[in-house]
Every structure is written in structure tokens, then in C-alpha cells.
């Protein structure tokens, strides 16, 4: 049988999905702190007015349980539903002072909600990370939490002859479009020399994102006239991660402790507060016995108080193990003030347990 004569039998299965986004603003957020399991509920909301399927958000500022006591816990709650259950995927993020998404987190699967049941994230964001960057994440003491809900609806099977070609959604994300400018050197107007590599870039984007780049372009220097600028003391890969953040706002690939530290240093050098927060949060999440001392040095060097507090607390809790690490021994020799001053001030404000832990460290 020839190809033209073959019968082509095909069909399509369409799973209906309804999506909506809910934005919840909590004013005077700093007054919401309390004990573990203390919760705040949002107003009840629905996809459309008077719909029987109703939801609300729930926040635990001090964590849902003992394990998550250092975090902000967030949940999506099914308040009412006429059916036995609803399957829905959900996404959470914080809207920062610039209107950008921060701490974007989504469900890995599509859980089933029953009436009064909730799903969410017990360790959504470190509370210290949130509070230590108030101007960026809590402008005017307001937390703006966003949740996108995708509800699974009916499953419809359709034969091929009845199929209507789907119209592609023409919308594009701004970050994706700017990312294309970063990937393609078209219309660039300056060159950046980094560790023997030349990178083409756009002055307007760099100046808008970084006050350091803006000042560099404004000054009447020979490099400016030639539109060629040498970037010193930065690793090429670190610089690429920083530039990717400048163009897209997306979190960098921090595949190691040293990379997170190097990108943090670059973020501070070029005035990128958002990138600095991301690196700080990554270092907090990945504290270990081996890197705790070096993390403390980095925190002290770059004046990141939240990271310093977390590192000091980690060292206090794991005093005997940290004191045996090579990083601790190196820190005692190179940064004795962190032992003599910071540890002493922290121990005086902590419990007897912490004081005894630091005595162990001081006597090492």
C-alpha cells in the first residue's frame, strides 16, 4: 500500500485546566510573630464569584512544627468543595519591592485536595532571610504572598477530524526576552574584558540593574570612550552567572559552596542586592561542619548579618564537630576576632547550653 493510500487514524485527549493567581498582602507583618504553629489565614477566594469551590492561604510565621521553626511555612487550603476531591497544582512566591518574583516554589506533582485539607511547604523561606531584608522583601512591613492554582477539570477525548488547531499563546515573559539579548550579541554597545574573555553587553541594561556599572559608564574615562571595560578580580564563570542574573533576574547555578561565596562577593561589588540575598540564602541552606567556619568569614567580610547569625548558631550547636574541622583551625589563625569578639557576644545572649559550647570552641 502506498503512503498516499494509508489510513491515518488519530485522536486527541484534552485535560481541562483552570488557572488563576491570588495575591495576598499581610500588613504589619513583623507583629505576626509568635510561637510554633501560630497561623494567619487569608480571606476565602474562588476562581469566579459565588463558585462552590473555595480556597484560602495559611501562613505560619514561625514554622508549622519543631523541624520548621526557623522557616516561614505556607499552605493552600481547600475550604469548600461540592465534589469528593479536587486535583490541583500550586505555585508560591513572594512579590518583592520591585514587583519581581522571589522564592518561587511549586508543587512537584498534582495532589488531591479534600475539603479542609491543605498542601504546601513547611520550609518555604528562612525567617531570618525574610526579616533581614525588609526593604526588599517586606516594604513598609508588608508581605505580599502570591499563589497560582491550576485546577484539573474534565478529560475530553476528541477524534482527529473534529480537532481544531490550537492557537498559540503569543505572550512572552520579559525575562525570556531580555535573556535572548544576553545570549545574542546583536545591538550591543560595549565590551567587557574578563579573565582573558571578551563579553559583549548593553550599557542601558547594565546601568539600570547595577549602580556600579552606571557610575562606570558615567565617568569620563578613556575606557568609556572606547566602550571597552576591563573587569578585574572576577572569575569568568562567576561573572557569567552574575550577568545572567542582571539580564533575566533568575537565580544563578550555585553548584558548590565556593561558587556561592564568589557570586556573593561579585553581587556586593556591583551592588546587586537581589543576587546577594539569593547567595546568602543558598549558603544558609547548605551550612555544614566543614564549611561553617569559612561561611562565617565570608559573612563577616561582606557584612551579611543574617548569614553571620545563622553560621554562629550552627557552630554553637555543632561545636565539638566544627572545632575539629580544618576550616575552624584556619579561621582561628587568620580571623581571631571572630572567635574573641563575635562568639563572646553571642554566647552572652544565648542559653547555658550555647555558652558551654563556645567555651569548648574557645579552649580548642
From Swiss-Prot:
A biological process (GO) annotation for this entry?
protein catabolic process
Q: Which residues form the BTB domain?
A: 188-255
Q: Which Gene3D superfamilies match?
A: 6.10.250.3030, 6.20.250.50, Apoptosis, Tumor Necrosis Factor Receptor Associated Protein 2, Chain A, Potassium Channel Kv1.1, Chain A
Q: Which Pfam families match?
A: BTB, MATH_2
Q: Which SUPFAM superfamilies match?
A: POZ domain, TRAF domain-like
Q: Where is the MATH domain?
A: 19-149
Question: What family does the database annotate?
Answer: Belongs to the Tdpoz family.
Output this protein's name.
TD and POZ domain-containing protein 2
Amino acid at each position: 500500500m502506498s503512503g498516499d493510500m494509508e489510513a491515518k487514524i488519530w485522536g486527541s485527549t484534552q485535560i481541562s485546566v483552570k488557572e488563576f493567581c491570588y495575591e495576598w498582602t499581610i500588613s504589619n507583618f513583623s507583629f505576626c510573630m509568635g510561637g510554633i504553629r501560630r497561623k494567619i489565614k487569608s480571606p476565602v477566594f474562588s476562581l469566579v464569584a459565588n463558585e462552590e469551590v473555595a480556597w484560602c492561604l495559611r501562613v505560619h510565621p514561625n514554622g508549622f512544627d519543631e523541624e520548621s521553626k526557623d522557616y516561614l511555612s505556607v499552605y493552600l487550603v481547600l475550604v469548600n468543595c461540592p465534589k469528593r476531591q479536587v486535583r490541583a497544582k500550586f505555585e508560591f512566591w513572594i512579590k518583592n519591592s520591585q514587583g519581581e518574583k522571589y522564592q518561587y516554589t511549586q508543587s512537584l506533582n498534582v495532589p488531591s485536595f479534600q475539603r479542609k485539607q491543605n498542601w504546601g511547604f513547611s520550609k518555604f523561606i528562612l525567617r531570618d532571610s525574610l526579616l533581614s531584608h525588609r526593604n526588599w522583601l517586606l516594604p513598609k512591613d508588608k508581605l505580599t504572598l502570591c499563589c497560582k492554582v491550576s485546577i484539573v477539570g474534565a478529560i475530553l477525548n476528541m477524534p482527529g477530524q473534529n480537532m481544531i488547531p490550537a492557537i498559540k499563546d503569543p505572550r512572552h515573559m520579559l525575562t525570556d526576552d531580555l535573556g535572548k539579548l544576553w545570549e545574542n550579541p546583536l545591538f550591543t554597545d560595549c565590551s567587557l574584558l574578563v579573565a582573558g574573555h571578551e563579553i559583549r553587553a548593553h550599557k542601558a541594561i547594565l546601568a539600570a540593574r547595577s549602580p556600579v556599572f552606571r557610575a562606570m559608564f558615567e565617568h569620563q574615562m578613556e575606557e568609556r570612550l572606547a566602550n571597552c571595560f576591563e573587569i578585574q578580580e572576577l572569575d569568568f564563570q562567576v561573572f557569567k552567572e552574575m550577568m545572567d542574573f542582571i539580564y533575566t533576574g533568575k537565580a544563578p547555578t550555585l553548584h558548590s559552596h565556593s561558587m556561592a561565596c564568589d557570586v556573593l562577593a561579585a553581587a556586593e561589588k556591583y551592588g546587586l542586592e537581589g543576587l546577594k540575598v539569593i547567595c546568602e540564602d543558598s549558603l544558609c541552606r547548605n551550612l555544614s561542619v566543614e564549611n561553617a567556619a569559612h561561611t562565617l568569614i565570608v559573612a563577616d567580610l561582606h557584612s551579611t548579618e543574617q548569614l553571620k547569625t545563622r553560621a554562629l548558631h550552627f557552630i554553637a550547636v555543632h561545636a565539638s564537630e566544627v572545632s575539629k574541622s580544618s576550616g575552624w583551625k584556619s579561621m582561628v589563625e587568620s580571623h581571631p576576632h571572630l572567635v574573641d569578639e563575635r562568639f563572646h557576644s553571642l554566647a552572652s545572649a544565648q542559653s547555658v547550653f550555647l555558652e558551654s559550647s563556645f567555651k569548648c570552641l574557645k579552649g580548642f
